[in-house]
């Protein structure tokens, strides 16, 4: 079985804050898949959106060195497993599957998750959540999940509200399968408080929410506090947190 990869590397998980399901501050091995069906305005992996144009993938030769070697796409599942094992430092919290959107290649994703389970690792899924029918396949293999709630300002798709409802359905599927799951909302200066209230009402009693300002941070502290306050009012004060891309401040991937 083969998969169109982007990269494999060892780093800290820099997102997620302190809500249940987050691995913030934990060391992970990141397995980044190529290909995404959305086009978010703030995407920081834009070079990997069109999987057909990702002719090679890279893997870190030694943890935290930033030294990579390249191989042609598509990769075999065993090649990816070998790259992961080469980066196991003995203190790995979980394997993070990210993208792009990993569920678009659901069969090799499941094969990798199954193999990592056999090797004793926990699986951490980072997903936009817009494909609940595929989430249903991977949910039983998932220990932790970060699921996006795409704000209207992301301009990810024309059917924005439909996307949000599918994301919430994916969260429900993951929670029912036993995965520790949280929702991640990236906010901007264009984010509307009434939209944050809507997201919070959908997530109430289902999963915690982290609010993450887009980098570089442009949203005001006053607006950020308003978003937080309104989400906490609806969801409960212990079910909301802030998230920042701390790995960028540490100058690591």
Curated annotation (Swiss-Prot):
Keywords noted in UniProt: 4Fe-4S, Iron, Iron-sulfur, Lyase, Magnesium, Metal-binding, S-adenosyl-L-methionine
PROSITE patterns per UniProt: RADICAL_SAM (PS51918)
Matching Pfam families: Fer4_12 (PF13353), Radical_SAM (PF04055)
Cofactor binding note of this UniProt entry: Binds 1 [4Fe-4S] cluster. The cluster is coordinated with 3 cysteines and an exchangeable S-adenosyl-L-methionine.
Positions with a binding annotation for Mg(2+): 45
Cofactor: [4Fe-4S] cluster; S-adenosyl-L-methionine; Mg(2+)
The protein's annotated pathway: Purine metabolism; 7-cyano-7-deazaguanine biosynthesis
Annotated binding of substrate, by residue: 12-14, 32, 98
Binding site for [4Fe-4S] cluster: 36, 40, 43
Stored Gene3D superfamilies: Aldolase class I (3.20.20.70)
Catalytic reaction list: 6-carboxy-5,6,7,8-tetrahydropterin + H(+) = 7-carboxy-7-deazaguanine + NH4(+)
Binding-site positions, S-adenosyl-L-methionine: 100
Superkingdom of source: Archaea
Domain Radical SAM core as annotated: residue spans: 23-253
Assigned EC number: 4.3.99.3
InterPro entries attached to this UniProt entry: 7-CO-7-deazaguanine_synth-like, Aldolase_TIM, Organic_radical-activating, rSAM
Disruption phenotype: Temperature sensitive growth at 85 but not 93 degrees Celsius.
Oligomer and partners: Homodimer.
HAMAP family: QueE (MF_00917)
Family: Belongs to the radical SAM superfamily. 7-carboxy-7-deazaguanine synthase family.
Protein's name in the database: 7-carboxy-7-deazaguanine synthase
Species assigned in the record: Thermococcus kodakarensis (strain ATCC BAA-918 / JCM 12380 / KOD1) (Pyrococcus kodakaraensis (strain KOD1))
């Amino acid at each position: 079985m083969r998969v169109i990869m982007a990269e494999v590397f060892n780093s800290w998980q820099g997102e997620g804050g302190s809500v249940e399901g987050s691995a913030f501050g934990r060391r992970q091995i990141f397995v980044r898949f190529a290909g995404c069906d959305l086009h978010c305005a703030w995407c920081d992996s834009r070079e990997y959106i069109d999987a057909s144009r990702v002719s090679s993938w890279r893997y870190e030769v030694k943890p935290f060195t930033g030294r990579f070697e390249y191989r042609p796409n598509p990769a075999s599942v065993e090649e990816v497993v070998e790259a992961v094992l080469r980066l196991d430092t003995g203190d790995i919290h979980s394997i993070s599957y990210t993208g792009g959107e990993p569920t678009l290649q659901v069969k090799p994703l499941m094969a990798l998750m199954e193999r990592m389970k056999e090797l004793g690792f926990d699986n951490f899924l980072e997903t936009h959540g817009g494909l609940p029918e595929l989430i249903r396949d991977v949910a039983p293999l998932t220990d932790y999940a970060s699921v996006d709630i795409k704000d209207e300002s992301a301009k990810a798709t024309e059917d924005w509200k439909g996307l949000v409802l599918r994301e919430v359905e994916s969260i429900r599927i993951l929670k029912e399968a036993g995965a520790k799951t949280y929702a991640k909302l990236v906010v901007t200066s264009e984010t509307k408080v009434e939209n944050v209230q809507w997201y919070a009402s959908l997530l109430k009693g289902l999963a915690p929410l982290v609010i993450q300002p887009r980098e570089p941070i442009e949203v005001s502290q006053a607006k950020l506090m308003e978003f937080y306050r309104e989400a906490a009012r609806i969801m409960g004060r212990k079910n909301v947190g802030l998230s920042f891309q701390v790995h960028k401040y540490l100058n690591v991937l």
